[in-house]
A protein has these predicted regions:
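Short, surface-exposed basic-aromatic patches at helix termini and helix-loop junctions that form
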Residues: 123-129
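RNase H-like polynucleotidyl transferase catalytic core
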Residues: 40-47, 129-148
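C-terminal anion-handling pockets and recognition modules
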Residues: 11-15, 146-203
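Acidic, metal-coordinating catalytic cores used for nucleic-acid/nucleotide bond scission
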Residues: 24, 108-122, 138-143
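Extended, low-complexity cationic-aromatic segments
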Residues: 1-92, 193-202
Length: 203
């Protein structure tokens, strides 16, 4: 991370921490309220293999508002041979969208997922002169602020009785959009990496 900070400063670039997460129709369980003496029951539809995958970036640059940029992908809706999760081309599209939105070079920090290290991904990275990549140490989620964003997302989806992949995708997007507008949350995610929350000079 320290090396990425130096490169970002030299290139007037954004530091973007990347990661992926997923949510199925079976929600995480959490404490809830019920009348005294009544056991609360959350009715869910956990059949099938529907899954909403999310790939996201928490983006940092001194003097600018912190950003959360994401893409979602829904799988398991009965289409034969449908890939699950994000592949190299999906990551490239996310990075291209972030570059257009941020209008500056990007220093990407992510983990050693096989799709991040593949020959195809390396070629896609090499084709983008505005992109520099740094890999996080193994088993170090505490260094990636977007892990906290995923934790918050999963807490907000706890006990959610989504019945279809489409309704689950809508719920995931709604919660991520709320998070995007609460920049103080994103700033809080960044502090654990040693980055000081930026005092925005411009939007």
């Amino acid at each position: 991370v320290a090396g990425g900070k130096r490169v970002a400063a030299r290139r007037a670039a954004w530091i973007c921490f990347a990661d992926e997460c997923g949510q199925t129709l079976k929600p995480h369980k959490a404490a809830t309220w019920a009348p005294r003496g009544v056991t609360p029951i959350a009715h869910v539809t956990a059949t099938g293999n529907a899954r909403v995958s999310v790939a996201g970036l928490v983006c940092y640059r001194p003097g600018h508002r912190s950003r959360l940029i994401y893409r979602t992908k829904t799988s398991g809706r009965g289409r034969k041979g449908e890939p699950k999760g994000f592949r190299e081309r999906d990551f490239a599209r996310l990075l291209d969208a972030a570059h257009r939105q941020l209008q500056a070079p990007i220093v990407l920090v992510w983990d050693g997922l096989s799709a991040h290290r593949s020959a195809r991904m390396r070629a896609l990275i090499a084709a983008r002169s505005w992109l520099r990549v740094y890999r996080l140490p193994a088993y170090a989620p505490e260094l990636n602020p977007i892990e906290q964003a995923w934790s918050g997302l999963k807490r907000s989806l706890a006990n959610l009785p989504a019945r279809t992949a489409s309704s689950l995708a809508i719920a995931v997007k709604n919660r991520l959009k709320r998070m995007q507008h609460r920049t103080h949350l994103i700033d809080g995610y960044l502090t654990g990496t040693g980055l000081s929350p930026p005092a925005p000079a411009r939007p």
